[in-house]
């Protein structure tokens, strides 16, 4: 919804989360198994720590029993991050998003003597032990630490990484003002958190793949007819992309290709699987390009989607609504902090898009015709710097940028892994054109 520039559709989601967090989030945080947290000092009516393991209904009510999943509040918080990143709405940040995310993080990383936090530090790293990643804890009952149930699940590690990075970013930008010791705690946990779990496939042997958790180790692929939890580190955890370290990106690509997620069809993972395909894909040089992804996606659509566009998978309601993210990300990606134009689209196939919304509150349009990217236009809503990968990688020199009919200075900046990026300053409300 956000990348489609239809963020208003998500408007009803946020009050549901905020109402329950304010009403019961602190109670659950103080009562949670192995993770009691009686933190005070919350903002805007929010408890000092928030935690919930159930499905929520409007008006601060629950609509199901305890599912045991400790990551639910983290999961819910990701949409708050996405809404702010795509809009740069500082009122939403300070009044709604930051108070919630700060309280959710407190349950995990701690908030003083009355809230030690769920994570444990062992051998110099913070570990997540027994958070019951799957509904009902069918991986094993709740058990006292250090019983290794669900050790460092990909879901919790990735979601916590994304949450902490966001909190640190908005603090360093001066948009929020956490106490110095709290900011230091976030930075320490992020720097020393257990990594995304990676292991080896049973077949073919010695093939690195993403795992759903460090332990217990499942035979890969992890689940059939179920939700492949290892994908969540890619999306919506957003911790793996084309600029990730080669070893991690290779493991992610192997995971996508080996998991065979359409045979059998997965339980309720449509909205995670295909964005993950796209975000670790490539336009040339690997199997994960748009042609492969669209063919694979069409198998699921033909088998399980009705004439009204509703995908008949496990779960209920909007659990399986998520195909638009995958399609948009084939044309434009920005979750890594910079723009990528047609990141998985074969250059031999024409394509175009108009006013997709990118991180940084940019509205972006472009076309690909005859193997050449043209008509790149960026509307800046918030006046932030715009950083991008040149879609003319074989052209020497800086791309040209103009705004209001005048040239705009473009600077070369180093991206992750030595990636070459370009950056220019923007003014809020101004339209910019990028050309070779």
Language model regions located:
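Acidic/histidine-rich catalytic neighborhood
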Residues: 103-170
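Non-catalytic C-terminal accessory modules of carbohydrate-active enzymes
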Residues: 284-436
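Residues that flank catalytic or metal-binding motifs in active/ligand-binding sites
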Residues: 72, 124, 156, 232, ...
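Active-site core of glycosidic bond-cleaving carbohydrate-active enzymes
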Residues: 1-32, 36-38, 51-90, 95-99, ...
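Short alpha-helical basic/polar micro-motif
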Residues: 98-102, 106, 325, 364
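Short, surface-exposed recognition loops and adjoining beta-strand edges that mediate ligand/DNA contacts
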Residues: 114-135, 215, 316, 340-354
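Short Gly/Pro-enriched turn/cap motifs at secondary-structure boundaries
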Residues: 65-67, 149, 224-225, 354-358
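Beta-sheet entry/capping signal
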Residues: 42-49, 98, 105, 124-127, ...
